[in-house]
Amino acid sequence: MKAYEYLKPGHAQLTDKEKPTITSSTDAIIRIVKTTICGTDLHIIKGDTPEVKSHTTLGHEGIGIIEEIGDNVNNFKVGDKVIISCISSCGKCYYCKKGIYAHCENGGGWILGHLVNGTQAEYVKVPFADNSLYHAPSNLKD
């Protein structure tokens, strides 16, 4: 698949990568229909976020179609059009239960395009799908 990845400060590239796969029962694989580039992505490319590793696919927002779901994804099905949140959340930890999703204690928060591969690609793996995706309105056009 095609993906736009960070290389090093001042450098990013469009490249070919392997399509992501389900690695946790709460994951979903989304075929990206629309994605965004925002100031945060530009800060990453500039080198302002040193924790972003070389070859990380950028992007943390998008709209897509679910192609595959893990066994413990209950709120979505294959074929659903979804909005991908910029914040991933487990929905179960202390902070998630209080609605403070950015502080998820179980590997959530701002991770897409930051700590894991993001949405500026043909496909993305979204962790904690039940809490990190939203059903798109049925009248939303591609």
Q: Model segments located where?
A:
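NAD(P)H dinucleotide-binding glycine-rich loop of Rossmann-like/cofactor-binding domains
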Residues: 92-142
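Residue-level recognition of beta-strand termini and adjacent short loop/turns
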Residues: 8-10, 24
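Residue-level signal for short segments within beta-strands and strand-turn junctions
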Residues: 5-7, 46, 66, 97
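Short Gly/Pro-enriched turn/cap motifs at secondary-structure boundaries
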Residues: 7, 19-20, 53-59, 111-117, ...
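Extreme N-terminal starter segment of soluble prokaryotic enzymes
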Residues: 1-2
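Short glycine/threonine/proline-enriched tight-turn/helix- or strand-capping micro-motif at secondary-structure
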Residues: 11-19
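Glycine-rich beta-strand-centered segment in the early N-terminal region that forms part
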Residues: 20-35, 48-94, 137-139
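Cytochrome P450 core scaffold surrounding the K-helix E-X-X-R motif
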Residues: 40-46
